[in-house]
Amino acid sequence: MPLSSVSAAQWRALSMRAAEPNGYYLPEWELAVNASARGRLDAAALGAWRDASTLIGLLPVISMWRAYKIPLPALVSADPYGTLCTPLLDRDMAEEAVTGILQQAPGAHSRRAPPSRTAIICPNGNWR
């Protein structure tokens, strides 16, 4: 799903409940990056919801090809400035959030990447 289509109110609420806060993934910051950072425009969002009104996990991503011109079937952080790419996970539903995010990964990859081989890569190594 396009990052810009995530409800800012749900996103903000998730950032307040996050198991590990991440300033690079606050809605105001990441939406500004999404609108203006060269090579990071129109990012995708891997998200997980408990129900239609409760976002429990969010990871803004782009393809590795768009980010680094490396032709691998991988997704990387949509934030070009930060070294922290820990996803926002609801502290009370982290397992469900991770499961939901990973289930979305094959559908969010580049059209050239086989769905079963899509990877999510975090440069600082704290989530794979």
Regions found by a protein language model. Name each.
Residues 1-128:
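N-acyltransferase acceptor-side catalytic subdomain
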